[in-house]
């Protein structure tokens, strides 16, 4: 049965195509010739539909602000908006004025600060570190005391 297949493959072929005399080859123009492109991808161009907003908030209101802007549940959003002091402003032509007011160190401001680490501790940093980690603020008025971990 194999010879029959060979005969079919090696059988007669159709005649080759012939081109008309007025035909010519088409050459595609390269976009690289018109302007040189740097290697890699071109950086994206950001076009804003609206001017970006500058949001001013206190450190203790930051989490509530992020949750409000990212779509927290309406009931929780109403409760946090009563105590939030975040201000949304639009700043146009902001200069490089570095004369910011110094951080207020009065007693009311210090009471709002908490003694929490600004990193997520792993078990290694929690039990392998000689430093103390405070998880509750000592400025709280309730009967709880701060929880302190100290490795010896």
From Swiss-Prot:
Give a yes or no for keyword Manganese in this entry: no
Q: Where is the composition biased (Low complexity)?
A: 81-92
What does the record say about the knockout? Answer: Pale-green and stunted growth phenotypes.
In chain numbering, motif VQ lies across 62-71
Function of this protein? Answer: May be involved in chloroplast development.
List locations, semicolon-separated. Plastid, Chloroplast
UniProt superkingdom: Eukaryota
Q: Which GO terms describe its cellular component?
A: chloroplast
Residue numbers spanned by region Disordered: 1-42, 80-108
Record-annotated membrane-spanning stretches: none
Name the chain's protein: VQ motif-containing protein 8, chloroplastic
The record's section on InterPro entries has: VQ, VQ_8/17/18/20/21/25
Ordered alphabetically, the record's keywords are: Chloroplast, Plastid, Transit peptide
Targeting presequence: 1-58
Q: Does the keyword Transit peptide apply?
A: yes
Question: Mainly localized where?
Answer: plastid
């Amino acid at each position: 049965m194999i010879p029959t297949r060979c005969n079919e493959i090696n059988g007669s072929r159709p005649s080759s195509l012939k081109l008309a005399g007025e035909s010519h080859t088409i050459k595609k123009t390269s976009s690289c010739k018109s302007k040189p492109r740097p290697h890699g991808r071109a950086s994206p161009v950001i076009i804003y539909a609206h001017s970006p907003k500058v949001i001013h908030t206190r450190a203790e209101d930051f989490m509530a602000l992020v949750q409000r802007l990212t779509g927290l549940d309406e009931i929780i959003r109403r409760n946090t908006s009563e105590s939030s002091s975040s201000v949304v402003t639009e700043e146009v032509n902001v200069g490089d004025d570095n004369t910011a007011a110094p951080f207020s160190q009065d007693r009311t401001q210090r009471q709002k600060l908490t003694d929490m680490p600004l990193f997520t501790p792993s078990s290694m940093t929690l039990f392998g570190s000689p430093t103390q980690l405070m998880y509750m603020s000592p400025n709280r008025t309730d009967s709880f005391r701060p929880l302190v971990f100290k490795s010896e």
